[in-house]
């Protein structure tokens, strides 16, 4: 799962994709 809830996505392109998925899914 992504770690965007903290507002600090993983570093690198992985974080970029993670952030995109989080934005698309938005699982709060």
Swiss-Prot record:
Origin superkingdom: Eukaryota
- What are the entry keywords? Disulfide bond, Mast cell degranulation, Secreted
Tissue specificity of this protein: Expressed by the venom gland.
Q: Where is the protein situated, by its record's location annotation?
A: Secreted
**Looking at the UniProt record for this protein, which Gene Ontology cellular component terms does it annotate, in alphabetical order?**
extracellular region
Q: Where are the transmembrane segments?
A: none
Disulfide partners = 2-18, 4-22
Q: What does this protein do?
A: Mast cell degranulating peptide.
Q: What is this protein called?
A: Mast cell degranulating peptide
